[in-house]
Amino acid sequence: MSQPFALHHDGENQMQRRGKMNTRSNGLSGQKRAALGVITNQVNQQVRIQPSRAAKPKSSEFNIQDENAFTKKNAKTFGQQPSQFSVFVDPTPAAPVQKAPTSHVTDIPAALTTLQRVPLTEVPGSPDIISLEDSMESPMILDLPEEEKPLDREAVILTVPEYEEDIYNYLRQAEMKNRAKPGYMKRQTDITTSMRCILVDWLVEVSEEDKLHRETLFLGVNYIDRFLSKISVLRGKLQLVGAASMFLAAKYEEIYPPDVKEFAYITDDTYTSQQVLRMEHLILKVLTFDVAVPTTNWFCEDFLKSCDADDKLKSLTMFLTELTLIDMDAYLKYLPSITAAAALCLARYSLGIEPWPQNLVKKTGYEIGHFVDCLKDLHKTSLGAESHQQQAVQEKYKQDKYHQVSDFSKNPVPHNLALLAL
């Protein structure tokens, strides 16, 4: 039989076991354990002491490699009563002491503090107060006094009263430039003055039918005369020049100008839209793109606004002004402002109004002696208007909206200008 193997006795472990046993015997002999054990945290200890963080031990008496290191440490404290600890309680903050606010206003007079408040009384009803229940109109709309004259917005926008004098002086200088040459028809080889009269008479009808502005008509005739002053035109192309000039003037003056196809259509499709556009391009090159020119119509409207003319005076003045478009030879030698002044003076004289008051002298800078020759020519033209071959202007101003100023049976033209003391 083999002998029983010998147990290895570890002296160190034996000593530890003896220590453990002695510790247990000493702890149990002094105090017996109750049913649920002895509660070391007594109930009457209400305050918990905040445990402090223990410092890291410098070294252990046992090697970290020893598997019984933790057992040994626990063996020393097993059965011992743990140290008591308390709970940290924040101290109750004291109530803040409120200080009485300091007033920035001191020494208020007693007269102000003892004022008695008077209750508001009801305001009796007034007939001027508008009741919203009885009126459907806005209470903010107030009637203007009858004697107050309404503002002429168009006059303010177009004339700009602050710069009216500067604008007028500038246009007086501009009218001397870009003028048609008087007597240019003598240098034309294939067209005559009567052909031009027929063309302008046709353009008057076109502008009236298409409801174009009067300024558009005057601009178109200005482009025609300036173009014919520099370029010889065949009679077969004269109507094309007129249509292209009116098309250019409409694009410059009108807000919604007619389409180029309409100008080709009014020629009974004699010319195509492409031909009208090509002629427009040629006219612009010949005129060097100077299309913004002052016309007789512009000066006439400016003079009429300055003298507060009524509708009949305006219509008669415009009728006399348009008569100058037909007769080229007599009026190309006059400046547009001179022609406008003569037309206004003759219209006032025909209606029995003072022909040329001082306010017009101040406005225009003209005396009657400055335009007396144009006045005589215009008087002669108006006397022969009824017998003229071209009657478009006559028929236009026989309408009621123009007060039938071209009907000489109702508005006869003075036979002489003797009362003007010329």
From Swiss-Prot:
> Among its keywords, does the record have Electron transport?
no
Chain spans, region Disordered: 1-29
Q: Name one GO biological process term.
A: mitotic cell cycle phase transition
Cross-referenced SUPFAM superfamilies: Cyclin-like
Origin superkingdom: Eukaryota
Keywords, comma-separated and alphabetical: Cell cycle, Cell division, Cyclin, Mitosis
Q: Which InterPro entries match?
A: Cyclin, Cyclin-A_N, Cyclin-like_dom, Cyclin-like_sf, Cyclin_A/B-like, Cyclin_C-dom, Cyclin_N, Cyclins_cyclin-box
UniProt xrefs under Pfam families: Cyclin_C, Cyclin_N, Cyclin_N2
GO MF: cyclin-dependent protein serine/threonine kinase regulator activity
Is-annotated flag, keyword Cell division?
Answer: yes
Family of the protein in this entry:
Belongs to the cyclin family. Cyclin AB subfamily.
What functional role does this protein have?
Essential for the control of the cell cycle at the G2/M (mitosis) transition. Interacts with the CDC2 and CDK2 protein kinases to form MPF. G2/M cyclins accumulate steadily during G2 and are abruptly destroyed at mitosis.
Q: What is this protein called?
A: G2/mitotic-specific cyclin-A
Organism per entry: Spisula solidissima
